[in-house]
């Protein structure tokens, strides 16, 4: 939370919140466009450059505080559906996150640290590992997992909402 408040730009704050509450990789978050969002359900469908869904990912979600920041920073209705939300170079985000961490004598925060924090936080909130893996784009390819695990968007959203992850609370 303290690192978030040290960031100078709303764009960087929005990126930090998305990385921390969705479990997505830096490249996935920084490649997002308005067309990747399901705004009604706070869902996000990251895509690779070729337009394919990343790895085996169905979708991930983001928290209410992230939603508020996104709507504060971006007017999704006025943006082109394929216009990137984040315009800075990826290394700029990593560098500025680390600088903000240093200002408050915090552990060095990087996009990877935020992804690890997401996994640990969701686990501490009682979310099963297989669902955390799904949010992070690591669904199993095993027959057992494919046929007996419910990775529907509705089920994943319910699990995410029940966990109640937040950075700013």
What name fits each language-model region?
Residues 22, 31-70:
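Conserved tyrosine-mediated DNA breakage-rejoining catalytic core shared by Y-recombinases
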Residues 52, 136-165:
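Catalytic-site neighborhood detector that most strongly recognizes the C-terminal catalytic loop/helix
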Residues 63-107, 118:
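Active-site/catalytic core of tyrosine-dependent DNA strand-transfer enzymes
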Residues 37-39, 108, 127-147:
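Short, polar N-cap/turn motifs at the start of nucleic acid-interacting alpha helices
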Residues 5, 10, 89-92, 108-113:
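N-terminal core-binding DNA-recognition domain of tyrosine site-specific recombinases/integrases
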